Amino acid sequence: MKLDQIFSVSLIYATFRSATPIIYAALCAAITQQADILNIGTEGIMLTGAFTAVAVSYMSGSWLMGILVAMAAGFVMAGIMALAHIRYKAEICAIGMGINLFALAITKFMLNVIFGTSGTFSDPAICSIPRVHIPFLEKIPVLNQIFNNWTITEWFVIVLIIIITFLFYKTRWGLRLRAVGQFPMAAQTAGINVNAMKYQAILISGLIGGLAGAHLSLGYSQMFTENMTSNRGFMGVAAMYFGGAHPVLTAIGCLVFGFADSIGARLQAYGVPSQFVLLMPYVVTIVVLSVSMISKQISEKKKKSSLAYVKSL
């Protein structure tokens, strides 16, 4: 086993490529988390978007149409979740799991109804997301390996991180969203429509979740496979906890998952048992969640001790 072949320059892009679907999923979860809503349904929204993107791309011959309709499908799924949770007071985790199970069932059913197959659907007629070729990077081998031939959605995820960070921390809307999540009673007293903000957060997350699925099926691959999200939605939620729902820190957490996945794939080529490789992302998930929970507990203890000191004065 040659370490220089495993830890080569191409590993950087492989890490980012593996992390991109998880970053989209994590951003989907981060938006609702800012409103104090745990979006367990990210997995289902993403899976629905993945199937819709492939179906529409195949029928229309347009990858852009596939993405737009996938985002619309994610919007509808998120709308169902928002209505059930906000209007009918259903428990958010139960609704999220229901969305996940429904998405798994409906995509499997529609795969059989529309394409007459099960398991996997792949066809040259599926229009994949284009890759961006930057000619001048060919003169710089290292940068060429890392940055050339990214898909449009891989570039866009970086833009999306910047946009969401700006919205959260530099706009009135973001301030209101965080107020609703942290101090809902105070926000309501200040005249903020708490339910309206929660609806907005969930619906926007649905758009991003649909985009996450579209990238997975049209950018990361060019096919649809039953349950192809493979728990990436849950990994995104874990990364969101790791980053405290901050878009940049959350994305860094996603890169940890991407690195584990990329390293695992390379180790398998050197005879490492496939069971170990398949186990790696889930071990990383447990570690990330454990670290984030411990750091959260430490932070809360510090806050309590600070408050106790102030009271003693």
Locations of regions flagged by a protein language model:
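Transmembrane helix-bundle core of multi-pass membrane transporters
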Residues: 104-169, 272-277, 304-313
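Loop-to-transmembrane alpha-helix initiation sites
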Residues: 93, 120-124, 149-156, 198, ...
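Helix-loop-helix "hairpin" substructures at the membrane interface of multi-pass membrane proteins
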Residues: 145-224, 247-248, 252
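Short loop segments and helix-boundary regions at transmembrane helix junctions
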Residues: 34-38, 79-136, 230-248
